[in-house]
């Protein structure tokens, strides 16, 4: 570990290892039918390399549809389809020849330090020729990064990915300073979501490169050489293979070159490196440079890390910070989830926050929901509610915490950290949640944690934020950057929504308790007295929030009951009438609503304890609808209270004793408190949104959020706490083992280790690339999810309904017998009379059943004795 720190602290001082140069020198010369300079005619080329018309217009039909090829020349054409993409991809990994039975020649690849396999592969001609000449021929660039894809089979733990062990990255090999390291973490997103993120990142890099009056980016080399983009895919099995075609089209991936193991030592991560100017939009349009166009994308240094096994997001971050970060030593690391699209100049705004504040350790931008064309997704109440929730969080919560200097959570989907700020204890605590370190850490790792700590690591970003602010001897702060915006997709169906919020709620609750219980560590930091005062104020605020969350279930029920009783129950004292159904009907309707409220709430416990959300969608949808209706009813009653109060109606406010009497009654009466709560809640939403010049969510999404407020308490909180034992990430997928070839080493005459690698001709590389581009640019079709209810789900659903029916019947009987409020529905007027009658019925029924059983026993005994006398011997 010390060696890793030493080397990461001086990434520009080491000499390039001769092994790496020898690898590049051993790369065979390119044999291709493509033109090698820009003056040659390419009208007959297989792919429209951007040379004949100097970058022809962008078209989604690249390569042109007029190209015909014999199916026998493409060994993969027969198997390409949405259904068989996994099988087809595996088949391409083991294919050794591109046409017929012809075998390719091989070349020797020397291993770095005798153990590290790192190979340079020629890229397709169309990709190589798409690089602008001003970059390709520049003295500041190295031609190899545009002509060859570098592949490294990392057979080590991320902590062992060091220069001493023979691992290196191109940006460090070329002695480049990395100012920004942008990490895109991926699980199983489709190619549209991935392209949305990657293209948005490349557009943001163009914004930085095109800065004109800058005192920083123009010094010490071109700006694009100071930025590295790292894509980290969490496992071969879960990843969408169509997404790999998109990456292959822009040049940062190739089929058939990955190795499952090196001499039996399994590959942990497959690392690809390439510098590209190509990009694909979410609509599958290929973006290529055009002649002297200032809007061209600059070269982008790419690292693609494809982990062999699914090992969760924390492990992906360990590859980022402990492996790539130590080699590149960036100033700022920006974290983006696949599917999140950074807005215009958003990454620049994040970086500027660090550049202008030397004590800033972490920052986040504004995340808003993806609403689709013409905001069509707002029709979905779940999407609309989440959109409003995100907006209010960005308008009220994040600015408040930023003012204190401690943002409790920097969303992993769109945030940034100063690399040297999180080094040390913050990352050490953060990585305790990595499952791959469980054996190494022992009791300090995930296996030695109790269920509370395991839930805490479901919101591991909160732990990192607290550890960063509390870092001993430093005064790092966290901030919210309003100018930086990111757009992300949100769950659109109840099962995905419940699974996501279960992880968020349990993780944030546990992490909040962690920060409160360990607040004394703040005193060891380097914060000044004023900052400590702010942090103490925030501590009190967080404790109040935790307390409100803990008692929210009872609080909402009591609030609902009180409002219904105030408005619906007639009172002789203040001479008000029952509303809205009159004196007689209003209490009855309210009691029915309360009974159903408790019934649906009870149902949530049964569903949460025994059923999967996917197996109980209908029950959850009915629950959502009912609680939304109840909330609408309560809102109507609340605004009726407001109208009555300001119109001088018969509400418990003092209008007869002047302003003093009115103010006194306003702050002491139940009606006044309801009015204060309404104005302070909804009023702050409206005023703050207008002040931030962002009021549109009030018109488009507030309806869904306000109607869905009881869902957060009665459904989400119940589901989260009932599944406290579940410490999974609530995602789907599996660890499919891909069949990749192995690398076997041999010894040369000089006893140097080498492997023999297929030396594929450039023509065959280009033919395979044509097929890849066709797959990548084909229109995306959303997969149709099979709505099949598993047999186990059907059993659990029946079990839940049976227990619920049994409980409700017993509860309803107890309510009817023992509650005075339902006297209008019964024959008697008091619960005492009903209880007496019920007690008599129970006694008579018990006695009758006992006598009946006794008579049956007597009959059996007499019958047996009588038959015994007359039975045959």
Swiss-Prot record:
Residues spanning the membrane: 532-554, 588-608, 621-641, 672-692, 702-722, 802-822, 841-861
Feature: compositional bias, Polar residues: 33-46, 58-72, 80-98
Keyword Transmembrane helix: yes
Keyword annotations: Cell membrane, Cell wall biogenesis/degradation, Glycoprotein, Glycosyltransferase, Membrane, Transferase, Transmembrane, Transmembrane helix
Localisation: Cell membrane
GO molecular-function term, one example from the UniProt record: chitin synthase activity
Entry EC no(s): 2.4.1.16
Record's bilayer topology term: Multi-pass membrane protein
PANTHER family: CHITIN SYNTHASE (PTHR22914:SF39)
Protein name, entry field: Chitin synthase F
Native source species: Aspergillus niger (strain ATCC MYA-4892 / CBS 513.88 / FGSC A1513)
Lineage: Eukaryota, Fungi, Dikarya, Ascomycota, Pezizomycotina
């Amino acid at each position: 570990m010390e060696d890793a720190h030493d080397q990461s602290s001086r990434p520009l001082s080491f000499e390039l290892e001769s092994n790496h140069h020898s690898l590049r020198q051993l790369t065979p010369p390119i044999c291709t039918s493509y033109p090698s300079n820009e003056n040659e005619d390419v009208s007959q080329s297989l792919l429209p390399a951007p040379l004949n018309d100097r970058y022809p217009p962008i078209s989604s039909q690249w390569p042109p549809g007029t190209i015909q090829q014999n199916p026998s020349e493409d060994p993969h054409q027969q198997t390409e389809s949405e259904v068989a993409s996994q099988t087809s991809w595996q088949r391409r990994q083991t294919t050794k020849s591109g046409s017929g039975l012809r075998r390719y020649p091989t070349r020797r690849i020397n291993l770095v330090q005798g153990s590290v396999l790192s190979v340079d592969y020629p890229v397709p001609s169309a990709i190589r020729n798409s690089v602008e000449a001003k970059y390709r021929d520049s003295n500041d660039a190295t031609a190899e990064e545009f002509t060859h894809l570098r592949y490294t089979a990392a057979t080590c733990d991320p902590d062992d990915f060091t220069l001493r062990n023979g691992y290196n990255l191109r940006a460090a090999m070329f002695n480049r300073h990395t100012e920004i390291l942008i990490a895109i973490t991926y699980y199983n997103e489709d190619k549209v979501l991935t392209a949305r993120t990657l293209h948005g990142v490349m557009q943001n890099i163009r914004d930085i490169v095109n800065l004109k009056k800058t005192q920083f980016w123009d010094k010490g080399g071109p700006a694009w050489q100071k930025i590295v983009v790292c894509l980290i895919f969490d496992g071969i099995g879960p990843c969408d293979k169509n997404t790999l075609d998109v990456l292959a089209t822009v040049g940062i991936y190739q089929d058939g070159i990955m190795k499952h193991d090196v001499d039996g030592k399994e590959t942990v991560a497959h690392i690809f490196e390439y510098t590209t100017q190509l990009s694909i939009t979410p609509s599958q349009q290929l973006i290529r440079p055009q002649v002297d166009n200032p809007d061209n994308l600059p070269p982008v240094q790419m690292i693609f890390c494809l982990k062999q096994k699914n090992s969760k997001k924390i492990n992906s971050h360990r590859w980022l910070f402990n492996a790539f970060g130590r080699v590149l030593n960036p100033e700022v690391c920006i974290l983006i989830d696949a599917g999140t699209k950074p807005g215009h100049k958003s990454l620049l705004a994040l970086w500027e926050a660090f550049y202008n504040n030397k004590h800033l350790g972490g920052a986040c931008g504004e995340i808003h929901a993806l609403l689709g064309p013409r905001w069509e997704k707002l029709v979905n109440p779940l999407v609309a509610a989440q959109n409003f929730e995100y907006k209010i969080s960005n308008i009220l919560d994040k600015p408040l915490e930023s003012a204190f200097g401690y943002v409790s959570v920097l969303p992993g989907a769109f945030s940034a950290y100063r690399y040297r700020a999180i080094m040390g204890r913050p990352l050490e605590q953060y990585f305790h949640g990595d499952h791959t370190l469980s054996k190494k850490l022992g009791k300090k790792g995930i296996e030695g944690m109790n269920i509370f700590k395991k839930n805490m690591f479901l919101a591991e970003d909160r732990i990192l934020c607290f550890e960063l602010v509390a870092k001993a001897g430093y005064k790092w702060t966290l901030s919210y950057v309003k100018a930086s915006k990111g757009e992300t997709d949100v769950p659109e169906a109840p099962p995905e929504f419940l699974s996501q919020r279960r992880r968020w709620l349990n993780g944030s609750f546990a992490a909040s308790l962690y920060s409160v219980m360990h607040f004394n560590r703040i005193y060891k930091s380097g914060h000044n007295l004023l900052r400590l005062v702010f942090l103490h104020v925030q501590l009190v605020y967080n404790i109040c929030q935790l307390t409100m969350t803990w008692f929210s279930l009872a609080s909402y029920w009591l609030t609902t009951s009180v409002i219904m009783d105030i408005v619906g129950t007639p009172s002789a004292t203040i001479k008000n009438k029952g509303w809205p159904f009159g004196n007689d009907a209003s209490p009855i309707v309210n009691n029915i609503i309360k009974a159903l409220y408790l019934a649906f709430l009870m149902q949530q416990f049964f569903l949460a304890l025994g059923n999967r959300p996917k197996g109980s969608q209908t029950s959850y949808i009915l629950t959502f609808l009912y609680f939304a209706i109840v909330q609408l009813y309560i809102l109507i009653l609340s605004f009726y209270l407001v109208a009555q109060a300001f119109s001088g109606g018969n509400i418990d406010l003092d209008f007869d004793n002047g302003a003093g009497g009115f103010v006194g009654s306003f702050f002491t009466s139940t009606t006044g408190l309801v009015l204060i709560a309404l104005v302070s809640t909804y009023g702050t939403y409206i005023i703050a949104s207008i002040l931030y010049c962002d009021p549109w969510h009030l018109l488009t999404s507030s309806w869904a959020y306000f109607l869905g407020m009881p869902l957060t308490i009665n459904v989400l909180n119940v589901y989260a706490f009932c599944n406290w034992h579940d410490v999974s990430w609530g995602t789907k997928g599996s660890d499919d083992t891909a069949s990749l070839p192995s690398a076997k080493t041999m010894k040369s005459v000089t006893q140097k280790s080498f492997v023999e690698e297929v030396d594929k001709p450039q023509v065959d590389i280009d033919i395979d690339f044509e097929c890849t581009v066709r797959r990548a640019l084909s229109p995306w079709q959303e997969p149709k999810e099979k709505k099949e209810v598993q047999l186990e789900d059907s059993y659990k659903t029946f079990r839940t309904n049976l227990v619920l029916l049994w409980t409700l019947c017993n509860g309803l009987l107890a309510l009817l017998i023992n509650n005075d409020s339902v006297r209008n529905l019964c024959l008697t007027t008091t619960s005492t009379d009903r209880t007496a009658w019920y007690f008599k019925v129970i006694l008579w029924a018990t006695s009758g059943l006992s006598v009946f059983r006794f008579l049956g026993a007597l009959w059996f005994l007499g019958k047996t004795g009588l038959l015994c006398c007359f039975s045959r011997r």
